[in-house]
């Protein structure tokens, strides 16, 4: 059987070692004779899973002790509402950086709760799509916080620069790039991320929030989205997505066993360099993102003749390269190469691309 490499943007590929262990433990976890999906979230066995998961995540990201780690429901879209309702307080505005599709989605949700100051940072660099450097972001004085998305999965645009905005509260949607590289958590007030790209299966959402920002929620905020309530209840205010939590915990251990975030950053750069080189080195393919803002996680590309898109997708699936269809908003192709994607998968893709170009160019 041809080895399958899954380039889906999310739910995305999980480490093979994690899946195999989950398969082995599925019906008899920890010698209990039952699945981890079937035990109480308040049992001592699952509480150990929860505690180890949090500690491993803290170790990986070097999360300071004055930050709470929350394991939540709802995905990033729930956080689009939770962030303003938890952080606005008595203020009526917040700075929202518009750098792409998902940043704009957060803005649309925020408009229900405040008057966002929208700062469009998209620009053209050598006729390619790019992002203005942070020093050019025109932040307002009265904003409750600054919100941005460091990696746009659809646009294939990344903001690698870390924020340095003095005492402003910075909120970042790290859904598609968390754990892919080292970051300084202390520069942020809130970091949130849906799990289904670089953490684990869909259904779990991580929130990392500085403790001094707790307890400021608006009265109308549903309790299940209140960071203070979730922190006070150790993310167990209601039954959490236990299986997704368990699998994510195994991914954290896998990351630590494979060298942590420094090693992931190195591997991800190597994979991205290989794929972008294959695109740039062949006139048959094109990526229109400026070099400084190219995503290491999500690589969109266009074929010279869009009439060949369907053939490319059919032949790629036959070659064991799945989920390469670009998002409906931009079309073309997209290869998502998160932590779990091995270098061998990217090599297989680039070899297929070269062969396809030879046959159809």
Curated annotation (Swiss-Prot):
Residues binding pyridoxal 5'-phosphate: 76-77, 102, 153, 173, 196, 238-239
Coiled coil ranges: none
Localization (cell): Cytoplasm
Annotated residues for binding of L-glutamate: 42
Pathway: Amino-acid biosynthesis; L-serine biosynthesis; L-serine from 3-phospho-D-glycerate: step 2/3; Cofactor biosynthesis; pyridoxine 5'-phosphate biosynthesis; pyridoxine 5'-phosphate from D-erythrose 4-phosphate: step 3/5
PANTHER family: PHOSPHOSERINE AMINOTRANSFERASE
Protein name listed in UniProt: Phosphoserine aminotransferase
Gene source species: Pectobacterium atrosepticum (strain SCRI 1043 / ATCC BAA-672)
């Amino acid at each position: 059987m041809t080895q399958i490499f899954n380039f889906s943007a999310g739910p995305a590929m999980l480490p093979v070692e994690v899946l195999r262990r989950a398969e082995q433990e599925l019906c008899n976890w920890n010698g209990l004779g039952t699945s981890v999906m079937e035990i109480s979230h308040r049992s001592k066995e699952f509480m150990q899973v929860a505690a180890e998961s949090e500690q491993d995540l803290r170790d990986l990201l070097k999360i300071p002790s004055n930050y709470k780690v929350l394991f939540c429901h709802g995905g990033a879209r729930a956080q689009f509402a939770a962030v303003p309702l938890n952080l606005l307080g008595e203020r009526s505005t917040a700075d929202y950086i518009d750098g792409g599709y998902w940043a704009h989605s957060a803005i649309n949700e925020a408009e229900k709760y405040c008057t966002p100051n929208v700062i469009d940072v998209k620009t053209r660099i050598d006729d390619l799509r790019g992002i203005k450097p942070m020093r050019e972001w025109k932040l307002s004085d009265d904003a409750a916080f600054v919100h941005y998305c460091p990696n746009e999965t659809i646009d294939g645009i990344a903001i690698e620069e870390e924020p340095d905005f003095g005492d402003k509260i910075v909120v970042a949607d790290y859904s598609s790039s968390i754990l892919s590289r080292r970051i300084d958590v202390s520069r942020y007030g809130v970091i949130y991320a849906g799990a289904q790209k670089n953490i684990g299966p869909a259904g779990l959402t991580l929130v990392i929030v500085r403790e001094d920002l707790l307890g400021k929620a608006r009265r109308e905020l549903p309790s299940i989205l209140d960071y203070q309530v979730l922190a006070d209840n150790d993310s167990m205010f209601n039954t959490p997505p236990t299986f997704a939590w368990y699998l994510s915990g195994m991914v954290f251990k896998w990351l630590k066993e494979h060298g942590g975030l420094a090693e992931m950053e190195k591997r991800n750069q190597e994979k991205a360099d290989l794929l972008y080189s294959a695109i740039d080195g062949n006139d048959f393919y094109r990526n229109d993102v400026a070099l400084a803002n190219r995503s290491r996680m999500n690589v969109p590309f266009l074929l010279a003749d869009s009439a060949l898109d369907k053939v490319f997708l059919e032949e790629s699936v036959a070659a064991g390269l799945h989920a390469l269809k670009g998002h409906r908003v931009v079309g073309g192709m997209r290869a998502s190469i998160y932590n779990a994607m091995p270098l061998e998968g990217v090599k297989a893709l680039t070899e297929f691309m070269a062969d396809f170009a030879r046959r159809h160019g």
